[in-house]
């Protein structure tokens, strides 16, 4: 399946506690999950590691969110949009389905 959402894409969250928030994709995992900057923040309890000089305690981290729960953000329409693929000049390109503009 082609990657409709890629790293550095601006996305909007469709479901969950962060619904409606926008952010940039920082990492895409092969299992269909994405990390979005500032979205799905969790608190982890980490143990100290004296050998590495790492202090323990509560650490806030971004957790992965399923790619089906985010949609690419179209800045022209200011809304979430769907992604299509087509060939232009022998290259496969992504485009917004609402206005046929290349991403």
From Swiss-Prot:
Presence of the UniProt keyword Ribonucleoprotein in the record: yes
Record-stated family: Belongs to the universal ribosomal protein uL24 family.
Annotated keywords: Ribonucleoprotein, Ribosomal protein, RNA-binding, rRNA-binding
Protein known as: Large ribosomal subunit protein uL24
One example of a Gene Ontology biological process annotation: translation
Aminoacyl-tRNA synthetase in keyword set: no
Assembly description: Part of the 50S ribosomal subunit.
Superkingdom as given in the UniProt entry: Bacteria
CC per GO annotation: cytosolic large ribosomal subunit
An MF annotation (GO) of this entry: rRNA binding
Listed SUPFAM superfamilies: Translation proteins SH3-like domain (SSF50104)
Organism per entry: Haemophilus influenzae (strain ATCC 51907 / DSM 11121 / KW20 / Rd)
Role played: One of two assembly initiator proteins, it binds directly to the 5'-end of the 23S rRNA, where it nucleates assembly of the 50S subunit.
Pfam families attached to this UniProt entry: KOW, ribosomal_L24
InterPro entries named in the record: KOW, Rib_uL2_dom2, Ribosomal_uL24, Ribosomal_uL24_CS, Ribosomal_uL24_KOW, Translation_prot_SH3-like_sf
């Amino acid at each position: 399946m082609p990657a409709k959402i890629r790293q550095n894409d601006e996305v909007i969250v469709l479901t969950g506690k962060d619904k409606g928030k926008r952010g940039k994709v920082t990492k895409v995992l092969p299992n269909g999950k994405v990390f979005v900057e500032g979205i799905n923040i969790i608190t982890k309890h980490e143990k100290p590691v004296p050998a590495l000089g790492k202090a323990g305690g509560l650490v806030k981290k971004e957790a992965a969110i399923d790619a089906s729960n985010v949609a690419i953000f179209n800045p022209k329409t200011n809304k979430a949009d769907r992604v299509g693929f087509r060939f232009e000049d022998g290259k496969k390109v992504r485009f917004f389905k609402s206005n046929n503009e290349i991403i």
